[in-house]
């Protein structure tokens, strides 16, 4: 089946009353009158019909009903070449996109059209991008940990199954590699899949991610069905309508895997701030009065309509990892502040750790999780995590003294604390499966129980006599002894 998003039809078969024509174009915003009583519903997809009955060329989404059978719609692609008087067709449904296994290994735009030059998507399954959040009765309210196999995350800032995680990190600190490892691990440990939504970011970054996924095996070009991820891109150069809706397109694909295939799904949104930014642009184009700092008055509603659909149900779960850009590092800005209200955990990547060669460069002190409570994770996990944080915090406090006076000026207790902290810091590094082809080291998936055991043994002094190099880029604590003997 050839897929142009839900609009494969004979133009002649469309009811004449469902046709309108363009009377005004302001950038990506179109005004279209329809016959009396035939105005389309909010969020319906409209298609601008080109001259000479050629292919429909621009898809729009109804945003406002202006009265007198006139609607205002926002285009999902460039409006270059459109003119007043062009025919517009009401499809009668919201934008609908392909879903299911055939989406794996492919790249889509906001309309669900493949943009990877690998041919059409063979599927009859389409879902509208607008739908309600799951009803309360279908939600799974149990607080359970989503084990990632990544030591520093599982121990110090565990993810909630069906929760939302904010990923903070600048360029070059390992964000992409961490994302790919999470995609790989969920596929192996849970038989789950991932959906990546590129919202308003650089086209080059999207291309780099795709190439790296092919190199690491996350996308299998020979057998696309064995790929572990579907990609949906609405990049910086696209109109605000596309950037505002591409997150919903990715979420719709993820919901199918959760609700129909009953799988655990990872949904990546990079960047959630761009979703808000695009909504702000659309709001201004529609003539709404701006709210605080120029943002749209519907900011909380738009964010909630996206975030509330990301949840666990009795069928499966969607766990979302969202890159968060903080404008001017101002955490009180309405965009990040509204996002934080929905997050269960934060994973902060540290440039100083990356500079030391410690990967993943997750900052153990700045990363947080609402799940790290004794009644949720258990007393042993909580106690170990707190002791690790206290040790690392003390080491951080002593670093200025060490830089000026050296280790010899510290007390015996502080020297021991520093030695153990450096071993923990290195033990929390880990070789990744997706980096095997670059590093030559086989990847390691480490269970939470093994991580807790390893940190407990280091803190108890069991390995005080081993060099700290033995703890670098290993999996379980048992590998430390073997590595120390080889060295």
Curated annotation (Swiss-Prot):
Pfam families (UniProt xref): ATP-synt_ab, ATP-synt_ab_N, ATP-synt_VA_C
Q: Which SMART domains match?
A: AAA
A GO cellular component annotated for this chain's UniProt record is: mitochondrion
Task: Report the PROSITE patterns cross-referenced here.
Answer: ATPASE_ALPHA_BETA
Look up keyword Transport and say if it applies.
Answer: yes
Chief location: plastid
Q: How does the protein associate with the membrane?
A: Peripheral membrane protein
Can you say where in the cell this protein is located? Plastid membrane
Quaternary data: F-type ATPases have 2 components, CF(1) - the catalytic core - and CF(0) - the membrane proton channel. CF(1) has five subunits: alpha(3), beta(3), gamma(1), delta(1), epsilon(1). CF(0) has four main subunits: a(1), b(1), b'(1) and c(9-12).
Describe the task this protein carries out: Produces ATP from ADP in the presence of a proton gradient across the membrane. The catalytic sites are hosted primarily by the beta subunits.
Q: Which family does it belong to?
A: Belongs to the ATPase alpha/beta chains family.
Name of the protein in question? ATP synthase subunit beta, plastid
Q: What is the source species?
A: Cuscuta pentagona (Five-angled dodder)
